[in-house]
């Protein structure tokens, strides 16, 4: 428009780096990071991140070089989420559960210049590096240790940090769409892919996550989401923007969570359904009461019964749907005021859905992949969940073919199946390869898993299809009972019949297996393992449904 101009006065490329610069000024003397006896202020955190960026730059890193890290949720990772991009680099936090071969695959693909490794994972990191064959120069290893007197042949993190210049000028992105992070998918559907996040997407998603999780200024965030998973759902950047406290955890269990909430007066955290289930079913000796409500964002819907238990313990849980390709969280189940006037069972059912796109996503829909049209809003028609907007990945690193396949017709096509309810809210039903075809009808496992969770004796459950001579496939439930609890197969099946009422009888399990339910490190059920177990059981005859 005539008389206007873009200049440095009115345009700065969006980047989470801005959050840290502001936090050091506005919240400088306030606590930023807590980990055991370690405690920093925002002024100190900014200083440490600048020194880290300077030390990395002194190694001769070029813009967009990769810096890798393998560590639990410790302060060094928080600093790397700023220090690496402030050096112009791209951070890749690797999955701490990867074995040496998976790590070697990730390192060979990303070719990092520097590799920060927590001493707990040093042996597997060294083994993975020994497997590399196509990298001319292996990365420089810097060890993260909690014992400064620990002997190591590698330079330690704090020593490396001390070489940095506190007056270093952070490198900003030239374009806000420049890469800031690489994240490997969990690999539940295929070999893990490497997803590229941009400065712009990270900035927008971080702000959206804070609003979704009902964060207030200066929150206290418990770091329960692994930082290797979708950049920790962008929460490190979020809490920085809000001037809060990041409570780091080396391990996550129910006792640590309750103790941390009370000790640090935690206001917010994120968690997968298994984490929430663990909290809901914690032993009475572990549970602790607190006179405030803790806001929880769940990356996946939990059964209403679990939500009710959490509510009574002092947690307000908002459900969300997402994946690595959409920066972790792509939707949120925003609670409507009128839901509070409904009977509790109906209110919880509505709140247990996956919701709608948050304000940093342009749209979410359930589309027929052939017609490219939206499905009826009937809560029944199962098709593919698709999203688009500014917080969708830039693409798959070094995989143009996969990127083009994922971006079709102006949408990112997930590998997840869902439905749309009459009010427009999305419900995730199953992974595309996990849906069960019963008598020619596509059936998701999510609802029946929720029913199984509501059984008083059931601690965990996963449902897959088992070969069936009559239906093609029928429901096979793998159930883990609570400690000391007892239940028989017939009892579980009858319970599902009663709960389903007049709904689709094909959802009733024909087989119940009592066993552990294998999970990925991020809490997703390893359906491929369960499917093989069900297949190895052979065909089942259809039970008569009374």
Curated annotation (Swiss-Prot):
Pfam family, one: AMP-binding
PROSITE patterns (alphabetical): AMP_BINDING
The protein, known as: Probable acyl-activating enzyme 21
Known function: May act as an acid--thiol ligase that activates carboxylic acids by forming acyl-CoAs.
Gene assigned in the entry: AEE21
Entry GO MF terms: ligase activity
EC assignment: 6.2.1.-
Family to which the UniProt record says this protein belongs: Belongs to the ATP-dependent AMP-binding enzyme family.
An annotated GO BP: fatty acid metabolic process
Keywords assigned: Fatty acid metabolism, Ligase, Lipid metabolism
Membrane-traversing stretches: none
Broad EC category: ligase
């Amino acid at each position: 428009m005539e008389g206007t101009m873009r200049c440095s006065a009115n345009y700065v490329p969006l980047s989470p780096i801005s959050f840290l610069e502001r936090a050091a000024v506005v919240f400088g003397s306030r606590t930023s990071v807590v980990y055991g006896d370690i405690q920093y202020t925002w002024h100190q955190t900014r200083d440490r991140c600048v020194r880290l960026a300077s030390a990395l730059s002194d190694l001769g890193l070029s813009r967009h070089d990769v810096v890798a890290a393998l560590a639990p949720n410790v302060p060094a990772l928080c600093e790397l989420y700023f220090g690496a991009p402030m050096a112009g680099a791209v951070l890749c936090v690797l999955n701490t559960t990867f074995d040496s071969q998976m790590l070697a695959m990730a390192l060979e693909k990303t070719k990092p210049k520097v590799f920060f490794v927590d001493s707990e994972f040093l042996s597997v990191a060294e083994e993975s590096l020994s497997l590399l064959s196509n990298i001319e120069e292996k990365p420089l290893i810097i060890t993260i240790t909690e014992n400064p007197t620990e002997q190591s042949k590698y330079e330690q993190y704090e020593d490396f940090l001390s070489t940095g210049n506190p007056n270093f000028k952070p490198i900003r992105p030239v374009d806000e769409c420049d890469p800031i992070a690489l994240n490997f998918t969990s690999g539940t559907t295929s070999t893990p892919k490497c997803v590229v996040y941009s400065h712009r997407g990270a900035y927008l998603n971080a702000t959206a996550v804070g609003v979704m999780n009902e964060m207030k200024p200066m929150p206290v965030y418990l770091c329960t989401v692994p930082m290797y998973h979708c950049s920790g759902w962008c929460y490190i950047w979020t809490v920085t923007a809000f001037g809060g406290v990041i409570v780091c955890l080396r391990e996550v269990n129910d006792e640590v969570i309750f103790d941390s909430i009370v000790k640090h007066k935690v206001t917010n955290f994120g968690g997968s359904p298994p984490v929430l289930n663990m909290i809901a079913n914690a032993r009475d000796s572990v549970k602790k009461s607190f006179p405030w409500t803790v806001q929880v964002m769940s990356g996946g819907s939990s059964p209403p019964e679990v939500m009710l238990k959490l509510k009574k313990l002092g947690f307000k849980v908002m459900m969300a749907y997402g994946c690595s390709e959409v920066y972790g969280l792509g939707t949120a189940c925003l609670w409507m005021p009128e839901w509070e006037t409904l009977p509790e069972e109906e209110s919880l059912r509505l709140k247990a859905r996956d919701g709608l796109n948050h304000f940093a996503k342009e749209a979410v829909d359930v589309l027929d992949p052939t017609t490219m049209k939206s499905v009826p809003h009937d809560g029944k028609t199962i098709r593919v969940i698709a999203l688009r907007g500014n917080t969708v990945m830039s693409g798959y690193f070094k995989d143009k073919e996969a990127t083009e396949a994922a971006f079709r017709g102006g949408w990112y096509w997930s590998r997840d199946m869902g439905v749309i309810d009459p009010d427009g809210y999305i419900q995730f039903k199953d992974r595309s390869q996990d849906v069960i075809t019963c008598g020619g009808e596509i059936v998701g496992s999510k609802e029946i898993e929720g029913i199984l969770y509501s059984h008083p004796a059931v601690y965990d459950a996963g449902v897959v299809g088992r070969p069936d001579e009559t239906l093609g496939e029928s429901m096979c439930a793998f159930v883990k009972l609570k400690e000391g609890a007892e239940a028989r197969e017939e009892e579980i099946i009858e319970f599902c019949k009663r709960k389903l009422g007049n709904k689709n009888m094909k959802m009733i399990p024909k087989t119940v297996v009592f066993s552990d339910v294998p999970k990925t490190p991020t809490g997703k059920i390893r359906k491929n393992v369960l499917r093989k177990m069900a297949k190895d059981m052979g065909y089942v005859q259809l039970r008569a449904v009374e």
